[in-house]
């Protein structure tokens, strides 16, 4: 299926790019999410005329996301959960829970699909989680999972000493 991107898509292309993608990917993801349109002759002409509008709209969205990223930067989210003695959680911390807590902290609605987890969080500790609000912009938050507030504070102190040791080594 040939499509034309009307929004930037990470690892695929930018606005106005004409691509050949798998039928299922186009039909089930790109078209319903309004990330692309079919590459028909009328649509090709339309994109040539409206490419500047799409780029201006994307630039405006990007500026908004940069403001939100400034709020998100250096956020530390603490989750208090029940866990076994060896630190394994009875359950897990999901990307939806991270999105909900982050949304409250920055007063902006962040979808769980914007939270990128390398692996599921199933034990206590300190994790770095990627937040991707725009195809070209991402930020990182620190997620601390602990059994109690005091344990969370201990993890924070550990993280600070690791960071200061890393800075001392690089200097």
Curated annotation (Swiss-Prot):
GO CC annotations? ribonucleoprotein complex; ribosome
Which is a GO BP term held by this UniProt record? Answer: translation
Q: Which InterPro entries match?
A: Ribosomal_bL9, Ribosomal_bL9/RNase_H1_N, Ribosomal_bL9_bac/chp, Ribosomal_bL9_C, Ribosomal_bL9_C_sf, Ribosomal_bL9_N, Ribosomal_bL9_N_sf
Which GO terms fall under molecular function for this chain's record? rRNA binding; structural constituent of ribosome
Q: Does the keyword Translocase apply?
A: no
Leader sequence residues: none
- Keywords, ordered alphabetically: Ribonucleoprotein, Ribosomal protein, RNA-binding, rRNA-binding
Query: What is a single Pfam family found in this protein's UniProt entry?
Result: Ribosomal_L9_N
| Entry function | Binds to the 23S rRNA.
Family the entry assigns: Belongs to the bacterial ribosomal protein bL9 family.
Q: Which PANTHER family match?
A: 50S RIBOSOMAL PROTEIN L9
The protein here is known as Large ribosomal subunit protein bL9
Organism per entry: Rickettsia akari (strain Hartford)
């Amino acid at each position: 299926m040939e499509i034309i991107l009307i929004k930037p898509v990470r690892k695929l292309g930018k606005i106005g790019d004409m691509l050949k993608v798998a039928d299922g990917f186009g039909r089930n993801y790109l078209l319903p999410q309004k990330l692309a349109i079919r590459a028909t002759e009328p649509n090709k002409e339309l994109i040539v005329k409206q490419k500047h509008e799409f780029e201006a709209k994307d630039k405006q969205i990007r500026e908004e996301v940069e403001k939100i990223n400034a709020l998100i930067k250096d956020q530390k989210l603490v989750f208090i959960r029940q866990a076994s003695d060896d630190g394994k959680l009875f359950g897990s911390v999901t990307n939806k829970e991270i999105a909900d807590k982050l949304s409250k902290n920055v007063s902006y609605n962040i979808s769980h699909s914007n939270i990128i987890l390398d692996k599921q969080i199933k034990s206590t500790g300190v994790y770095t989680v990627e937040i991707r609000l725009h195809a070209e912009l991402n930020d990182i938050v620190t997620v601390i999972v602990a059994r109690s507030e005091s344990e969370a504070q201990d993890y924070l102190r550990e993280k600070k000493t690791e960071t200061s040791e890393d800075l001392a080594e690089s200097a």
